[in-house]
Amino acid sequence: MAFVPKTLDYTVSPYTGLTRQSWIEAGTYLLEGVFQNIAHFEDPVVMPRKETKVTYPHSADAVWEFKAEYFEGLARSFFIAAPLIHDNPDLNLCGYSIRDYYKSHVLRACTKGDPVSVGRYEELQEMAGDYNRAFQQTVETCALVICLWVCKEEIWDTYTKKEKDVIAEFLRGYADGNTVPQNWRLFNMLDMAFLDMEGYEIDEEIMLDHAQSILAYYAGDGWYRDGHSFDYYSCWAFNVYAPIWNLWYGYEKQPYIAAKFEEHSNKLMETYADFFDRDGFTNMWGRSNIYRNAATSAFDGNLMLHNSTADPGLARRISSGSLLQFMTRDDFLFKGVPTLGFYGQFTPLVQGYSCAESPFWLGKAFLCLHLPADHPFWTAIENNGTWETLGSKDTKVTSLNGPALCFSNHQANGETILRTGKVVKNKKDEHGMWNYSKLCFNTKYPWESAVASDIEAQQYVLYDGVSDEIKKGNVTYWHGLKNDVLYRRQFFNYDLENECHWIQAINLADFTVPYGVIRADKLRLFSCPIRLTLGSYGFPDNGTQIIEKTADGAKAIILKGHDHTGREKQMAMTIYDGWDELEIVKSTGTNPDSENSIVIYAKTAREKKYGYQPYVLISQVITKESLEDFTDDEIFPIEKVHYTDTKKCGGYGPVTITLKDGTTRTIDFEGIEGQLIR
């Protein structure tokens, strides 16, 4: 059953109607789902498990994994519970005092020998037999200390000195212990900052080493590099934990680093609101998408700073819009608990480091409830930022060279499209390519997994006739935006064993139109024969009308239908020069919105090894949230294509595309070779 808010106020919240009380109702709704699965007060937060092949615990004898699962359930659900406990210490759900439950289980989790102990750091080292290993528990200690801070008066302050010492000793092992050299360093930093704040001695050299490392991961534009990739960890980790660290430790003891963290968060706020669409929807992109609207927690992180620049009315509008995106769907929960998916259960999305309780990381979005009722986040009138300034067919494009992110806000359909670069994935990591290597990510068309071995949504797939292999784009270099055209290069089956000239590739060039994106990509092949396909977005198939059209040598397929919620959907894909055919493929179990789906795909082939054959591939995908017909000019927008080369293959020189509305875009790959960044 979907969440339905009881409290609505369209005066202060004209877009969503949600208020602070609405958020309390939403948090209570989620906690009721948790506690309906807890049979006895003594039982840990272990939830019903729907998926068993990918997620952990992976085997019945993996004791440390069960302990990690206990801790994930406790600490992540505490994200939701802590602000509710602070707001209402007498909260009682399913017959349990929520304050008493978390007070008891936090202490028990930290107590050696207790049946629900999650394992001290030293115990796990001995159990694993690896003294250089980091453990999942380190992640959860950070959630624990944040929540103990949020409801400090109700839980932490009520422990005896002896009980506090037990918890502090437990935390110290992870605070000083091994971590992963990426966002995990912030977990250790907050553990130490909490201990320091509560009067316990810490190793300040360890703190400073982690802090300087985090600072060094900064790539610009408010984004941090996490591992190799850029993703929402920059938002729900770096730009949430760093502001909290500033409050607890940095402003007082490391003012230079704290000032930098503040500067970076404020830089993110300059553009981050435009990462979401007109409805406040979060885009399905990057790993750990089961955390869903946790992406909005970066706004709350910024509002904690001494010199915050976030627009509170816009921040709440987006946070509430994203909350409704997920919680109002009838497939969001499994037995009262958020599924391992983006909407309903969707296994292609799930990583092996997750368990049934992992989705409660979305509880970070509820940390905004720590802001008092009179805070501007709750009192400012909702506004919709960029969307209030765009004309009916306007598109705003933001390109960030630091993290290699280009996102466009399309007023015509209310969608936001993300195009990314600096992507490096192993050529066998199909899952990683779905998360990062799609050519476009759309807030209203979440990415589709493989519908066939040689067809992918929003990806090129190349069959190499020489090696007899199907190859996919696992590495994407970034050049950036030039004269309204975004340039990138994608390699197929990139590896370090071969120089790049021995790897099949395609130069990417794309630009926005009101309802989507036009592509004018150029093949960069070292050998033929090859076959190539390019898929549209995945389209939810709940009864779909399929229409085919042709005009002036171009071909289009239009799909009309509805998504799982009944929302009207329409998509059209059009092919021009360089392509041979346009077809559809139907699929089951590959779409995160609906069980059945359709992908439109273009296909072509190149046979002659060194033939001067068409190099440029021109196509368009447009979408709208309506069954109202696209106009012919929207489906077939190109008036003419002018080539520099006399054979009109696009082998050299600029290619100029003139649209029927008079817009011209010049595609010119000259000069990008020396300015490609990964």
Regions found by a protein language model. Name each.
Residues M1-A2, R678:
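Mature N-terminal, pre-catalytic/accessory segment of carbohydrate-active enzymes
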Residues A2-E72, D100-H105, D114-P115:
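Low-complexity, Ser/Thr/Pro/Gly-enriched N-terminal "stalk/linker" regions
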Residues C440, D454-R678:
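Extended repeat-based interaction scaffolds and adjacent low-complexity, acidic/S/T/P-biased segments
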Residues Y256-I257, R287, D311-I318, H375-E382, ...:
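Composition- and surface-driven signal marking solvent-exposed, interaction-prone regions
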Residues T52-A62, Y343-F346, N384-L390, H501-I503:
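Short linear interaction motifs
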Residues W387, G391-T476:
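Low-complexity, glycine/alanine/valine/leucine- and proline-rich hydrophobic stretches
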Residues G113-E126, I167, D277-M284, I290-K428:
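Carbohydrate-active enzyme catalytic cores, enriched for enzymes
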Residues Y70-F71, F79-L91, G95-D300:
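Aromatic-lined, polymer-binding surfaces characteristic
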